[in-house]
Regions:
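Active-site metal-binding loops of divalent metal-dependent hydrolases
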Residues: 36-38, 74, 98-99, 148-149, ...
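Conserved protein kinase catalytic core
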Residues: 31, 41, 79, 175, ...
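Conserved beta-strand hairpin/beta-sheet module of binuclear metal-dependent hydrolase folds
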Residues: 4-65, 155-168
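Histidine-centered catalytic micro-motifs
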Residues: 69-79, 143-152, 208-215
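Accessory terminal helices/loops
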Residues: 2-7, 98, 186, 193-284
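A contiguous binding-surface segment within folded domains or other stable secondary-structure elements
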Residues: 157-207
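Short Gly/Pro-enriched turn/cap motifs at secondary-structure boundaries
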Residues: 10-14, 116-117, 122-124, 144-148
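Active-site HxH/HxHxD metal-binding segment of metal-dependent hydrolases
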Residues: 38-139, 163, 231-232
Length: 284
């Protein structure tokens, strides 16, 4: 591994099928944590930090310093552990600047009133499309890739050759396809264009997924390449038109159930991982 190559490690959470990532610059020991998970029991409403503590332990073992706590979007299927990790490790919580749109939409749905600022100010940094940033000496670029939600971002990390992209819920492994677009603010046509934006990267670019649902009961996989997605993705491989994709995605979305954790997840995640204020009886 050269000093310009990132060390990337994935951490799979079987309860939510979510993959969190640690991205380390070996030269400087600076790192980013992407799409962390705060464990949540929907029956009791209790949280735990078991998944996040795996990241804590690994950061300590690597003697690394956290610069970024990155969110690819406001997740609807798990709660972020970013505030906990920030308290323990430091770093800036970052998300796409269109988080304000998500807060506007869900602020109305959840009737948050003035309790939730709808300008993204809960986050430490709001990324613009194409914005350059760094993890240690690693050069990175934020790409706005909406469709699943209005605020979805992909983060591209250069390694001096083809690089790696953390694509959130834009794409899945080729045998599972693409993300749903039926949440408020989602749009299948927009997602098609965002996917093409990702697939315009060099064909050997590594793509790191936010989820793997193990179709057919196969083993967990969460890394593919641009080339593999172009030729093999069951929803958007070469030859599938925009109209065909939109029709397929619309039909499929109509058959899907809502995620188990959508109500707590969106309320917490649009607040950068902070819980809503307690009600008058002290219960959140």
């Amino acid at each position: 591994m050269t000093n310009t190559s990132p060390q990337i490690e994935g951490f799979f959470d079987p309860a939510t099928s979510t993959v969190s990532y640690l991205v380390l610059d070996p030269a400087t020991r600076r790192c980013a944590l992407i799409d962390s998970v705060l464990d949540y029991d929907p029956k009791s409403g209790r949280t735990s930090t078991a998944s996040a503590d795996r990241l804590l332990a690994r950061v300590a073992a690597l003697d690394a310093r956290v610069e970024w706590l990155l969110e690819t979007h406001v997740h609807a299927d798990h709660l972020t552990a970013a505030p906990y990790l920030k308290e323990m490790l430091g770093g800036k919580i970052g998300i796409g600047q269109h988080i304000a749109t998500v807060q506007q939409v869900f602020g109305k749905l959840f009737n948050t009133g003035d309790e939730v600022a709808r300008d993204g100010s809960q986050f430490d940094h709001l990324f613009a499309d194409g914005e350059l940033f760094s993890i240690g000496a690693l050069q990175c670029r934020a790409l706005h890739t909406p469709g699943h939600t209005p605020a979805c971002m992909s983060y591209v990390v250069s390694d001096g050759t083809y690089g790696a992209a953390f694509v959130g819920d834009t794409l899945f492994m080729p045998d599972y396809g693409t993300a749903r677009c039926d949440f408020p603010g989602g749009d299948a046509r927009t997602l098609f264009h965002s996917i093409n934006k990702v697939l315009s990267l060099p064909e050997h670019t590594l793509l790191y997924m936010c989820h793997d649902y193990q179709p057919g009961g196969r083993e967990v996989r969460y890394v593919s390449t641009v080339g593999e997605e172009r030729t093999g993705n069951i929803h958007v491989r070469n030859g599938i038109s925009e109209e065909e994709f939109v029709a397929m995605r619309t039909r499929r979305d109509a058959s899907l159930e809502m995620p188990t954790l959508i109500l707590p997840s969106v309320q917490v995640n649009m607040r950068a991982g902070h819980f809503p204020e307690p009600e008058a009886n002290g219960i959140r």
